[in-house]
């Protein structure tokens, strides 16, 4: 092989490689939203169903990079030290609680999450990017690992598999009392950990119940304005299968943090 060609190939490979601790999410389209129907005895929440995940629609997303892990306390501490940003209330005198360095930071507002990502040279993912990444290449599936539910049948087998897959109350029969070390559970098909459970994750999008009726089919940016920001993925306190599904949409006040909400960053 010509030396110049070999150098060019190596250079292009290096340019295409994702940054450290990030996974490359390939460009492609996928079904976004709810693409299946529930039996009433499967979940029992149809009466209070917002139906904001309908209609299901095909969406194309350009290639991007996504953090493999939720942003940790120790990472946020470096940001706070460099920028004099405020720290979460549960830190002890402004310091990360001992032993929780690799836990996901939580009780941070959307604005704090946005500021961290920008400081790190990244950004918050759009809601569509988040769902594309969470699915891990599995289209039309309820969960990041496929269609297997979290103990829907009540069998010991289902519960055991779930406990090995995610940190959430539903999986561990009520045992979790908070988030756990990032990366404690197997990654999805794109190499991302804790896209289900541990903490909910802020996205860049404003929440609009009816956005799926008007969303563009390529790289939807989210609504131009709103009151709440979209959060995704479910958290350690969830005992409802619905909250843990790839398509499930939730929202929160961007000016308020919560013990169940954290974030991770994306990058073009």
Per-segment meaning from a language model:
Residues 24-25, 31, 36-41, 45-48, ...:
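Functional-site microenvironments in short loops/helix caps that host divalent-cation chemistry
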Residues 1-85, 110-111, 137-139, 148, ...:
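Short, compositionally biased
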């Amino acid at each position: 092989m010509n030396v110049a060609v070999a150098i060019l190939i190596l250079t292009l490979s290096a340019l295409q490689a994702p940054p450290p601790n990030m996974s490359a999410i390939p460009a492609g389209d996928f079904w976004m939203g709810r693409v299946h129907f529930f039996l009433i005895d499967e979940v029992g929440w149809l009466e209070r169903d917002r139906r904001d995940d309908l209609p299901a629609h095909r969406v194309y997303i350009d290639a991007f990079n996504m953090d493999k892990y939720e942003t940790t306390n120790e990472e946020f501490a470096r940001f706070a030290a460099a920028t004099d940003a405020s720290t979460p209330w549960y830190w002890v005198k402004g310091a990360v609680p001992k032993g929780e360095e690799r836990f996901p930071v939580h009780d941070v507002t959307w604005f704090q999450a946005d500021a961290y990502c920008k400081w790190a040279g990244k950004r918050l993912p759009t809601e569509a990017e988040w769902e594309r990444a969470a699915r891990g290449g599995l289209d039309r599936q309820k969960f990041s690992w496929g269609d297997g539910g979290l103990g829907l049948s009540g069998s010991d087998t289902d519960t055991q598999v779930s406990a090995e897959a995610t940190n959430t109350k539903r999986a561990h029969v009520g045992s979790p009392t908070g988030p756990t070390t990032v990366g404690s559970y197997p990654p999805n098909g794109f190499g991302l950990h804790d896209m289900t459970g541990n903490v909910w994750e802020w996205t860049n999008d404003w929440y609009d119940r009816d956005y799926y009726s008007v969303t563009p089919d390529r790289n939807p940016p989210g609504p131009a304005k709103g009151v709440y920001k979209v959060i995704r993925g479910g958290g350690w306190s969830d005992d409802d299968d619905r909250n843990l599904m790839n398509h499930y949409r939730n929202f929160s006040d961007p000016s308020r943090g919560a013990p169940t909400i954290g974030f991770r960053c994306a990058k073009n």
